[in-house]
Design a protein with these regions (language model features):
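Short, low-complexity N-terminal leaders and the immediately following helix N-cap/first helix
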Residues: 1-66
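Short, glycine/charged-enriched hinge/interface segments at domain edges or termini
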Residues: 58-166
Length: 166
């Protein structure tokens, strides 16, 4: 009989070569990646909302004071997965935006829904303070960028890796 220590040594020295294979990403969970996997997209594709709320241009809040709130006109709604918003953004415009919604050009900041004060007619929101630029924004490519290694060779595929296979 072989001792425990000797058997460990034999197993450590043994080399088993398993053939590489190409499989569908849906079948890759708990499999070992044989080469580095590179992203072929930026993810997220565009700047998007980190929270449900309202998109604004932070410059429109310069000089605002608690005693003198400014009305921002609600011009639409943006859901995650929607095509980019094409409306022309004017000064003091805002748009409702859901988490993951792409932020249209002209807006640069998200105010979370919990912080929103609506005008009585619900066609406007009221803002009474300076809002910092890029608050609650997830930037394009912040998870991973095109050409970046997203899964290293010899990594066991986990659920969070599968999105990178797009």
């Amino acid at each position: 009989m072989i001792s425990y220590e000797k058997s460990k040594t034999i197993l450590k020295k043994a080399k088993i070569k398993i053939k590489d294979e190409t499989i569908k990403s849906i079948n890759s969970l708990n499999r070992v990646v044989s080469t580095n996997i590179y992203s072929n997209i930026n993810y997220p594709a565009g700047n998007n909302a980190a929270f449900d709320g309202y998109a604004i241009n932070s410059k429109d809040t310069n000089g605002l004071k608690k005693k003198f709130p400014k009305k921002f006109k609600i011009i639409g709604s943006i859901a995650a997965g929607m095509k980019p918003f094409k409306k022309k953004i004017k000064k003091f415009d805002t748009a409702e935006i859901m988490t993951g919604g792409i932020i249209p050009k002209g807006f640069d900041t998200i105010i979370p829904i919990e912080q929103i004060i609506f005008a009585p007619n619900k066609k406007y929101i009221l803002i009474d303070q300076k809002i910092k630029k890029f608050d609650h924004v997830r930037f394009a490519g912040s998870d991973y960028r095109k050409g970046e290694v997203v899964i290293k060779k010899n990594t066991i595929v986990q659920p969070n890796h599968i999105l990178a296979f797009k």
